[in-house]
């Protein structure tokens, strides 16, 4: 009797600690020790906690109700993968090779179901049209023709229905993705349809990863000449004093930034700055990252990781009359064409005490190392791609991105292209 009571007490105690558990198994030779679990708010990953490996397994205890997308990131190897939560235990096994994730095996029902549905949907959108086009070149009585016909028939079948009671998030995601983001031309939705969806959705809208693409679709539906009208109509319905209104406002500011729609970005960034109500963490983050890189602001300092061509420990340690800070990547085609132009004028710039600091968004060490052998300026990289800390700190959405700083590290110019950099210093 005592044993039964003790076991019941342990179970009760554990259930108080966690609403659900995320368990991730890795092979013995996987070298990472730390894993970070993220939830989602709109398009922003939110850190929940960091755990250390124990018996080749990471175990996260999530204390609250959560339905939506989640992500685990391994900072040492820059591996990451996504999965879902339906407020039930999540069980995942990783297959790795050379310390990189080769495959993710979902062992819980919800993630296995979601994975199969997404795989089927992708094949239907991308592969089915191609198979249908090549079918006419093969006879049905040939071995390949028969296989082709079978695969077309399989992909053409409607997906098995999803029970919204058993799988509320899977139902929400797939139903609304199909309605608002499908490539099917017959499924046209109006701006009013999208406004109603955003306004009336439950909290799964913010955790689903659908919000950003749905907003882009909303803007596209309104057309380029009606952007302000469309946005004002949406925000008037949502009310920017509400958490959802502020999340949408934050997303729109980021969208305008990514697509270089500066006039609209400035208009709605100004609206956000002038709000007198309580600001959510989501909008506050957007305001901060934009404030960091405004003209006249002091460029936030950065601690170098493995800097090349300098003994300086931080960005501010580099003394110069001006600094050109570049965010770039060895795989960026625009960087490939623009950085050599800067290289051609490097000696002229250096003679005027103008230093260049290039921070890379690479992930592949070999690619980065080979590329920087040609660049005599200060180079550094975290080798974490868009997971690099400076992507958020400096509000970087594309490469290359340029900043020009004065001797006191104040931002005095934000050139669009390398030609603008050279024109600013009159070295073209």
Residues covered by each model-derived region:
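N-terminal "domain-start" segment that seeds a small globular fold
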Residues: 277-316, 423-428
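Bacterial Sec-dependent N-terminal signal peptides
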Residues: 1-25
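Structural micro-motif
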Residues: 67-69, 376-378, 395-403
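Short active-site neighborhood of thiol/selenol oxidoreductases, capturing the structured segment around
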Residues: 313-342, 355-359
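N-terminal targeting signals for export/organelle localization
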Residues: 225-298
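A non-transmembrane, solvent-exposed segment enriched in polar/low-complexity residues
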Residues: 19-190, 194-197
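Thiol/disulfide oxidoreductase modules built on the thioredoxin-like
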Residues: 386-426
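Structural microenvironment flanking redox-active thiols in thiol-disulfide oxidoreductases
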Residues: 337-373, 386-392
